[in-house]
Amino acid sequence: MINKPIVIPSPNKKRKAVLNYLGKIQSGREYYSLALDEIPLSLQSRIFGHVCLWSSDSRFLSVQEWKENDEVAGPKSYLLLIFDLFTRRECIVAEVEGAKSEINPQGFIGESLMYTVIYDGQFGITKNFESNFQHLAGWQTLK
């Protein structure tokens, strides 16, 4: 079975994020490569989940990156990343342990990114968070 790329256009239709299917872990979660129009090289050899969320002005894109993926157990950790396509930078918003949780962007409100962390386990807790991402330390230039 050939999986077609998932194209996620920006709200202004001037940019697009493209997820290309790479595989599936034992739990059924799928993982992808990510391509962005204007950033061809810096995302190579990185693995992403299926969630991409654009800001309403099409400047920011938030994604879930998988770190140290194991095809059976899944990723060692999930990163919630944000890309600033105007300044061509990226920043880690949050990180959670992959075997016990998952992290997903939910929405942009003003200068904040709302996101959810789902903690697996016996009681399965879900927590919502807010990050004023533009003031985070650790922004790095995309190559």
Language-model-derived ranges and their functions:
Residues 33, 51, 60-62, 79-84, ...:
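Ordered hydrophobic segments in well-structured contexts
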Residues 25-33, 69-82, 121-135:
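Structural motif
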Residues 1-11, 83-143:
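Acidic, small-residue rich beta-repeat scaffolds with periodic aromatic anchors
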Residues 36-41:
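Short strand-turn-strand beta-turns centered on an Asx-Gly dipeptide
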Residues 52-57, 63-77, 87, 99-104, ...:
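Acidic, low-complexity, intrinsically disordered interaction modules
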Residues 42-47, 94-97:
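Surface loop/turn motifs at the tips and blade-to-blade linkers of beta-strand repeat domains
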Residues 11-26, 58-71, 108-120:
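Short beta-strand elements that form the blades of beta-propeller/WD-repeat-like
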